[in-house]
Amino acid sequence: MSEITDVYAREILDSRGNPTLEVEVFLESGVMGRAAVPSGASTGEREALELRDGDASRYLGKGVLKAVDNVNDIIAEQLIGMEATDQVGIDRRMLELDGTEYKSTLGANAILGVSLAVAKAAAEEVGLPLYQYIGGCNARELPLPMMNILNGGAHADNNVDIQEFMIMPAGARSFSEALRMGAEVFHALKSVLKGKGYNTAVGDEGGFAPNLKSNEEALEVIMEAIAKAGYKAGEDILLALDVASSELFKDGKYFLENEAKPEKTADELIDFYENLVNKYPIISIEDGMAENDWEGWKKITDRLGKRVQLVGDDLFVTNTKILKEGISKGVANSILIKLNQIGTLTETLDAIETAKRAGYTTVISHRSGETEDTTLADLAVAVNAGQIKTGSLCRTDRVAKYNQLLRIEDELDVTAQFRGKDVFYNLR
């Protein structure tokens, strides 16, 4: 009864008002699975291709009708008759149909929408929640959230170079407690910013985006907010950064325009990070070096890799082949997992497994352009990832994922696990 009878895609809007893809997969039993595809603002060079129409007369060229047609006219007829429970077979069929390394024929957005909708339909068919269908009976660990409460870089129109300043409520005893702690710090930060006369408008991911005097002032106001909320920085709450340094890299140098000395070599940028790590309880730095600066990545890993989680996002783009290269060269110690960087659920699970076998931590992540789809919340629990990055404590597109995790925690009840600080198992 899990035989696929129809596959249908439509164009919808994401949280930034840009078109994206939604796919529905129908089974012989009458069951339907639906999934929507996210979209990034800062993207890695080697990400799978997000197919856009390029028609300036519609959505400023960002329409996805080509991807929609690829699902409805090409992919659908290939999958009708296949069993939805054959996730690997279905994903392989789509990869063969596309025939390119970066999914440039059909579009990774088209392929991913189908891949996720198939998994949702199959889970519904067998009567299991999505996280349990994907992960099995041992899928029960709720992730420590990495909450983006202050935005800069490509995620905000302000003068802060670093893209994301995040809090991690690592002292919490449960996911629900971590969420509450994060929300309280978020509201305290709004009060702190207002008190200093700063704008409290929010960026793409729900974090505040004020024009601060420096990158370090962002850390200072967050530290003040943590104290104002009644918590201890370094014990209850840890800090994390996403530098998105590929956006700052030009001609072999890094340019942080709002620093006293904007132009920095790789060594000078690592000095900058080391100084921040010594002054503030920073436990994680994402994309601290540019995606093509592998020498810089090796240097930062050698210097900070025992003290700080060094997350490769643009560096690895959820690609098992690139991740294996990084592991062999000893760069980074963690990988950010974004479903649409690679384009199928099967390949995503392969990347997670590869990382775990090498002792790399895994962080399941949203994109700046999100929808109400909550698949990544289920994925985080399915693979016992330990960490999730899904934005701030406002905007429904972000909060939807947190609320889904609350439901999962409630459903798991006493079997639910939450490791807090222990998710950083490879730091000593």
Swiss-Prot record:
Molecular function as annotated in GO: magnesium ion binding; phosphopyruvate hydratase activity
Cleaved signal peptide residues: none
GO biological process: glycolytic process
Main subcellular location: cytoplasm
Binding site for Mg(2+): 242, 286, 313
Functional pathway: Carbohydrate degradation; glycolysis; pyruvate from D-glyceraldehyde 3-phosphate: step 4/5
Needed co-factor(s): Mg(2+)
InterPro entries xrefs: Enolase, Enolase-like_C_sf, Enolase-like_N, Enolase_C, Enolase_CS, Enolase_N
Cofactor binding notes: Binds a second Mg(2+) ion via substrate during catalysis.
Localization terms from the record: Cytoplasm; Secreted; Cell surface
Enzyme Commission numbers on file: 4.2.1.11
Binding site for (2R)-2-phosphoglycerate: 163, 338, 367-368, 389
Keyword Protein biosynthesis: no
Pfam families named among the record's database cross-references: Enolase_C, Enolase_N
Active site (record annotation): 205, 338
Top-rank taxon: Bacteria
Uppermost EC category: lyase
Reactions catalysed: (2R)-2-phosphoglycerate = phosphoenolpyruvate + H2O
Any single GO CC term annotated in Swiss-Prot or TrEMBL for this entry: phosphopyruvate hydratase complex
NCBIfam families: eno
Role description: Catalyzes the reversible conversion of 2-phosphoglycerate (2-PG) into phosphoenolpyruvate (PEP). It is essential for the degradation of carbohydrates via glycolysis.
Assigned protein family: Belongs to the enolase family.
HAMAP family according to UniProt: Enolase (MF_00318)
Name the record gives this protein: Enolase
